[in-house]
Swiss-Prot record:
Homopentamer. This is Large-conductance mechanosensitive channel. Signal peptide: none annotated. GO terms for molecular function: mechanosensitive monoatomic ion channel activity. It is found in: Cell inner membrane. Channel that opens in response to stretch forces in the membrane lipid bilayer. May participate in the regulation of osmotic pressure changes within the cell.
């Protein structure tokens, strides 16, 4: 089997494609959350704290500037993304649990076979 054919089979497998879609959606979702944090949440927090720009907060040690405001903004960004993923996983697990608890519908063939089994059991007990 050629290397190219093996790679194609690997890439087209369900799990790899699911992972690729998840990564693309994750990157897009991260951009949305970053825009939310940078454009809405942090300016509101800065306004509540007296109109300061949180992302611009820093202090200097010697010739080095420590930008702790930018770090704080990224921590808030991470917390929002992590919480959203947590909620999504909880929802998926809940839906899977509900689906697992549902009884499987009985097909007509199974119902007929069950009736035949019951009739045979009754007839054999009469003998």
């Amino acid at each position: 089997m050629s290397l190219l054919k093996e790679f194609k089979e690997f890439a087209m497998r369900g799990n790899v494609m699911d992972l690729a879609v998840a990564v693309v959606m994750g990157v897009a979702f991260n951009k949305i959350v970053t825009a939310l944090v940078d454009g809405i949440i942090m300016p509101c927090v800065g306004l509540l704290l007296g109109g300061i720009n949180i992302a611009g907060l820093s202090f200097t040690v010697g010739d080095v500037q420590i930008k702790w405001g930018n770090f704080l903004q990224n921590v808030i960004d991470f917390i929002i993304v992590a919480f959203a993923i947590f909620v999504l996983i909880k929802l998926i697990n809940l839906l899977q649990r509900k689906k697992a608890n549902e009884p499987e519908p009985v097909t007509p063939e199974i119902q007929l076979l069950t009736e035949i089994r019951d009739l045979l059991a009754r007839n054999s007990s009469k003998i």
